[in-house]
């Protein structure tokens, strides 16, 4: 069976030309060249916003004072906008002034580092790597 292969007969030029013509016409039917573009009415259209930092787009627009005041008011902190807190979270730190005037010379509240002779001596020993805890 493997030895009984049929050899294809070479088609004549007329038949070959007819096949190529059918292929060419089929390609022309399926291929569509778009030269006119339009918006599809069934698709959702996205609005294209202008560039706010572009100087050439905004030449004709005058500055709106009311809009600028609104932006400046929104940029202020809540303490400048409102006389009292608006939420419970704002209550923390709303009054930033200390309740008691801090006195820097009061030893009960202020514990500053004090360098005396013994502390300077011990700091020097530690910087040299000596340790006398076990003596």
UniProtKB/Swiss-Prot annotation:
Protein location: Cytoplasm, Cytoskeleton, Cilium axoneme; Cytoplasm, Cytoskeleton, Flagellum axoneme
Position of the signal peptide: none
A single MF term (Gene Ontology): microtubule binding
Region (Disordered): 75-100
Top-rank lineage group of the source organism: Eukaryota
InterPro entries tied to this protein: CFAP144 (IPR029214)
Keywords recorded for this protein, A-Z: Cell projection, Cilium, Cytoplasm, Cytoskeleton, Flagellum
GO cellular component: axonemal B tubule inner sheath; axonemal microtubule; ciliary base; sperm flagellum
BP terms from Gene Ontology: flagellated sperm motility
Predominant localisation class: cytoplasm
Pfam families associated with the record: FAM183
Function statement: Microtubule inner protein (MIP) part of the dynein-decorated doublet microtubules (DMTs) in cilia axoneme, which is required for motile cilia beating.
Assembly behavior: Microtubule inner protein component of sperm flagellar doublet microtubules.
Similarity field: Belongs to the CFAP144 family.
Protein name in UniProt: Cilia- and flagella-associated protein 144
């Amino acid at each position: 069976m493997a030895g009984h292969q049929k050899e294809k007969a070479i088609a004549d030029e007329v038949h070959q030309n007819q096949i190529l013509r059918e292929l060419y016409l089929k390609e022309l039917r399926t291929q569509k060249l778009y030269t006119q573009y339009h918006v599809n009415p069934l698709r959702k259209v996205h609005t294209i916003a202008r560039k706010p930092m572009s100087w050439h787009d905004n030449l004709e627009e005058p500055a709106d004072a009311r809009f600028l005041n609104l932006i400046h008011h929104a940029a202020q902190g809540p303490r400048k906008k409102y006389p009292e807190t608006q939420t419970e979270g704002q209550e923390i730190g709303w009054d930033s002034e200390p309740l008691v005037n801090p006195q820097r010379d009061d030893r009960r509240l202020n514990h500053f580092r004090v360098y005396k002779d013994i502390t300077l001596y011990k700091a020097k020993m530690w910087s040299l790597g000596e340790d006398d805890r076990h003596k």
